[in-house]
Curated annotation (Swiss-Prot):
A GO term from the CC aspect: cytosol
Record comment: activity regulation: Inhibited by fructose 1,6-bisphosphate (FBP).
Organism of origin: Aliivibrio fischeri (strain MJ11) (Vibrio fischeri)
Amino acids binding ADP: T14, R18, T268, G311, G412, N416
Gene assigned in the entry: glpK
Protein name as catalogued: Glycerol kinase
Keywords: ATP-binding, Glycerol metabolism, Kinase, Nucleotide-binding, Transferase
Reaction it catalyzes: glycerol + ATP = sn-glycerol 3-phosphate + ADP + H(+)
Length: 504
């Protein structure tokens, strides 16, 4: 009898590093997690220590093996998924970062982005990278490090510095500096990668003064990039065989590998991705065009829309409004009333994301009458998550011409049955909640497992994407459209608040 083998997924997130071990049936055998420090040097700036990221990630790997009593020679391969856009620059001779990692949330490069717009590069960037000009992406962060760290520019020109997103840094460290690589999904979030040619965009690198020698080699999301030694020299050599950015890994973990398949991750915000296959769709409706994973981990195209306030609006009800003691109670109170009684909550606390991209919109409650109580406001807040999701899905359908047949969902808020049913009603499609909540780790594990032959193909994996529950739409069309029109009016109110201020 052959000894049982396992796949490890390393899930390097914004607040914690996790390691997840899966068996051949894609069951989770063991999980280990460690949080790390969030550094805020100035208002709007966010950093991490790259050495702490690596230390927490490597220790969770050792911990989770020990916890499950699994030896390192039983690991068939390692898959990596990571927070996207976060930028690390290090010296390849010393292995030391020249500065902290600049995190995706960091807004310090807003001025550089304005200059790119003034230089008339907005359309070129959208057409060739699929992205909007924003501090969110890596390109302007690399430039900031080279411009502001003493000696960095000279070392970069001399070929001594390397750039990487978090996946690249982890692989470089795990292979003792032998492998400098990223995958298409992470490269597509840098704002300097051309998604038409699948090469680094030399025009944009030149514009930002970034030497090409710093950039990692870009490969597919499912192949053996190198090996790591667990247990030091003479230890077990394990192939690192899968890499994908967190949202693309979740899309793959949900088995959305064909054109028109879509998923929504309900976290602090909501991340919607729709696979558009080999067809690159340039959005005219405020979405990003990005790279995802095709059936074998090869590059395929996707549309992405981010909603800023998903689960965060429930936290607001709990922490600021004190309407809930526990976020889980929101479902109970929302179902105590039959409707929201004409109330709409637009949680534009930090502006509105896709498809509006309105930084000046502000949170708004409209439609209040004397009969409205706290339960109506709780219900309307939950409903806002579903309405914002529909805003993005409508934009995706308009851009791609593809009609959504069903939506696969994951993330913390999917445990709320009221929200999932309302989501199905608002979209008029079935909503499928997966049984495994760890879909991001699952995606990374699948990509690695396919590359090393742990799983033979997609047919084998499709059986593992088990649905916990499907929610079917109930509303009649007139009621659905009437409610959604009300939401659109409420959004206009949230947007006009700043406009009215300008008129004063």
């Amino acid at each position: 009898m052959t000894e049982q083998k396992y796949i490890v997924a390393l899930d390097q997130g914004t607040t914690s590093s996790r390691a997840v071990i899966l068996d051949h049936d894609a069951n989770i055998v063991s999980v280990s997690q460690r949080e790390f420090t969030q550094i805020y040097p100035e208002a709007g700036w966010v950093e991490h220590d790259p050495l702490e990221i690596y230390a927490t990630q490597s220790s969770t790997l050792v911990e989770t093996l020990a916890k499950a009593g699994i030896r390192s020679d039983q690991i068939a391969g390692i898959g990596i998924t990571n927070q996207r856009e976060t930028t690390i620059v290090w010296n390849k001779e010393t292995g030391k970062p020249v500065y902290n990692a600049i995190v995706w949330q960091c807004r310090r490069t807003a001025d550089t982005c304005e200059k790119l717009k003034e230089a008339g590069l907005e359309e070129y960037i959208r057409e060739n990278t699929g992205l909007v000009v924003d501090p969110y992406f890596s390109g302007t962060k690399i430039k900031w490090i080279l411009d502001n760290v003493e000696g960095a520019r000279e070392d970069a020109e001399a070929g001594k510095l390397l750039f990487g997103t978090v996946d690249t840094w982890l692989v470089w460290k795990m292979t003792q500096g032998r492998v400098h690589v990223t995958d298409y999904t992470n490269a597509s979030r840098t704002m300097v990668f051309n998604i038409n040619t699948l090469q680094w965009d030399e025009k944009l690198l030149k514009e930002l003064d970034i030497p090409l020698s710093m950039m990692p080699e870009v490969k597919s999301s499912s192949e053996v990039y190198g090996e790591t030694n667990i247990g030091g020299k003479g230890g077990t050599r394990i192939p690192i065989a899968g890499i994908a950015g967190d949202q693309q890994a979740a899309l793959y973990g949900q088995m959305c590998v064909e054109q028109g398949q879509a998923k929504n991750t309900y976290g602090t915000g909501c991340f919607l991705l729709m696979n558009t296959g080999k067809e690159k769709v340039t959005s005219r409706n405020g979405l990003l065009t990005t790279l995802a994973c095709g059936p074998r981990g090869e590059a395929s195209y996707a549309l992405e829309g981010a909603v800023f306030m998903g689960g965060a609006s429930i936290q607001w009800l709990r922490d600021e409004m004190k309407l809930l003691a526990d976020a889980k109670d929101s479902e109970y109170f929302a179902t105590k009333v039959d409707t929201s009684n004409g109330v709409y909550v637009v949680p534009a606390f930090t502006g509105l994301g896709a498809p509006y991209w309105d930084a000046y919109a502000r949170g708004t409650i409209v439609g209040l009458t004397r009969g409205c109580g706290s339960n109506h406001i709780i219900r309307a807040t939950l409903e806002s998550i579903a309405y914002q999701t529909r805003d993005v899905i409508d934009a995706m359908q308009a851009d791609s011409g593809i009609k959504l047949s069903a939506l696969r969902v994951d993330g913390g808020a999917v445990a709320n049955n009221f929200l999932m049913q309302f989501q199905s009603d608002v979209l008029d499609v079935a909503v499928h909640r997966s049984k495994v909540t760890e879909v991001t780790a699952l995606g990374a594990a699948y990509l690695a497992g396919l590359a090393v032959g742990f799983w033979n193909g997609l047919d084998e994996l499709a059986d593992k994407a088990v649905i916990d529950r499907s929610f079917e739409p109930h509303h009649d069309e007139e009621k659905r459209n009437q409610r959604y029109r009300g939401w659109k009016r409420a959004v206009k109110c949230a947007q006009s608040w700043a406009e009215l201020h300008d008129e004063e």
